[in-house]
Amino acid sequence: RNKAMNMFSSFENFNLIREKAEASRKAENRPHEVLYFHKVDDPYSHLTVHYIDKFKEAYDVQFKPILVGEENPAALHEPTLYTDYCLEDVIRIASYYDVDFPGKSYPDKKLVDKANSILTAVNPDEFGSVAKTVSHALWSGDLAKLEELEVSYKSSEQEVIETLKEGNEIRNGCDYYFGSAFYYEKELYWGVDRLNHLEDRLTELGANKSSDNEPVCLLQTKAPDTLTAEKSVNLTYYPSLN
């Protein structure tokens, strides 16, 4: 087990995997393709979708949005606790990413179905802009807005089922089980707080369109220059291998 963990966390091994992935991409003459997994009733997807168009403008990539449905049950040991925490977390952090999150509870299934139907019909090039509008309407409980969008973006129930099924299969094939994540050449970047790591990787590969190297997604907060306390504290660090 220790040997496996050392291999997993080895920076040398990490770089080797990246080098092989890039060599394979070049040999196959493939563009820089970034997959984005979007789940309409995932609170974190409401955050990530606000950065799609900015990301596409900043990097020379082939961007492929993929609509996904329910998570793999095997990945959720405490489903209720997980969903409750996701909602609470996004309510707390949305403003720090300059995103308005209107949700106070999870949307009704009827609205979720309409949101999926609309996005099933959306052209990939306009997915970012339409998905933002859909997400705001969904989490606001704005049925009228979703019905208005349905006039322009129509999908049959079977088309939605097939789209979500295909999206789930692609997602599962990437060893991932949720929404709100970006996937590039064997690596997953889950949520807005990890998007900068994908940006760093693409910048190293020369895929950025400008030379300013300013991140697309930046947390809107500033820590104090110095921290003072009247007494010492014990800090426990729990690293996540996610």
Segments from the language model and where they lie:
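C-terminal cap of thioredoxin/glutaredoxin-like
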Residues: 2-14, 48-56, 129-227, 233-236
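Non-catalytic pre-domain segments flanking phosphatase-related domains
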Residues: 5-31
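Short, composition-biased local secondary-structure segments
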Residues: 20-26, 54, 58-64, 220-224
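A generic fold-level signal
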Residues: 29-30, 228-230
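Short loop/turn microsegments at loop-to-beta-strand junctions
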Residues: 32-34, 177-178
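Short, well-ordered beta-strand elements
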Residues: 33-36, 233-237
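Short strand-loop junctions, especially beta-strand C-caps/beta-turns
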Residues: 37-39, 187, 238
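Structural alpha/beta surface segment adjacent to cysteine/selenocysteine redox centers
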Residues: 40, 46-138, 234-236, 242
